[in-house]
Amino acid sequence: MEKSFSVFFIPCVSKILLAFFPALFSIRFVFCTFAKILSMKHTEISTLGEFGLIKRLTENFPIKNNSTEKGIGDDAAVLDYSNKKTLITSDLLLEGIHFDLTYVPLRHLGYKAVIVNLSDIYAMNGQPKQIIVSIGVSKRFSVENLEEIYSGIRLACNIYGIDLIGGDTSASLTGLTISITCIGEGQYGQIVYRNGAKENDLICVSGELGSAYMGLQLLEREKIVFETSGAIQPDFQGKDYILQRQLKPEARADIIDNLKKHNILPTAMMDISDGLSSELFHICTQSNVGCRIFEDKIPIGEQAAIMAEEMNFNIITAVLNGGEDYELLFTTSLSDYEKLIQIDDIGIIGHITSPEKGLALVGRQGEEIKLKAQGWNSLQ
């Protein structure tokens, strides 16, 4: 077992597990070392062997979808998507790049790893059905740690009706790696791409933006305070919501369902994983259009705004460039306006223009600020 562990803080279990039923009501954090957590119980992965580990991690994943003919237990899964399009997406999460185990509980990590994939399928106006999970772990992780990750994966599968149909687990020389592939279905003629936005279309977003990024800034701030001063209790009072948005995001299946109920088919759509500005660039570039979004129309969470003011941070910068909101950004025909305003939790933030007008944010005084694609980039 590795001897070197960085000291980190984790949520007090009695409080943070409330995040799974279904929201964080209050959070109280305690500090401990990773070594101390592992010492509570530590079953070496090698003691189970490959097949024993697979059985232990996947035995409580019942099949839920008719399209899954064969899941775990053979050389390959078998799916049947008769008369429907198949959608496939994949996301790779690397310790130290995409998550920090200083403050991310393993259960939440498993849940979030699933959600970021489901969100991509919903962003295509599809329905996610199956996932494949592959994990690389160093020797500092135990069977119990993997079970924690899989408990979060299982919860996401149960809530969203997803089948776990396969994957792989391998030793890693450093850290923790999680790769999830999600398979979903889309109806013919109903799949929404990024390249369909047209001049005069409305630009819409679900939910509110900036909370996940400000939650991350809060966690990073308190980590630095702990590492430099050894303070035992971080200051998270009144910040439950932004922590939830960072640690346990949700995919907006409800928005897709409501759009269908109101007979609205977006002309272009994607999820907001890397920041509003970056995603607007994707849609406008692929659709060969420009856009105008209005600062006073962008939905911003109250806790996010308060946190930004406390940290002397521009909340609009957080919204444009922060990311990890996993809300839906989409465009629709102007003729859908009356139907759109009947749907809760959707905001109209601007409109599509001709390409020569470029992309701009219209400030509260009417000034136009050129948008830049400065979203989060793991390769930088």
Which ranges hold each PLM region?
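Residue-level signal for inorganic ion chemistry
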Residues: 78, 117, 125, 164, ...
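Polyanion-binding loop/helix "lid" in catalytic or ligand-binding cores
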Residues: 233-281
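Short, compositionally biased
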Residues: 215-236
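Glycine-rich anion-binding loops of enzyme active sites
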Residues: 80-83, 93, 128-222, 351
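Extreme N-terminal cap/leader segments of soluble proteins
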Residues: 33-105, 124, 133, 152-155
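Glycine-/charge-enriched secondary-structure boundary and capping motifs
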Residues: 38-52, 56-62, 104, 140-163, ...
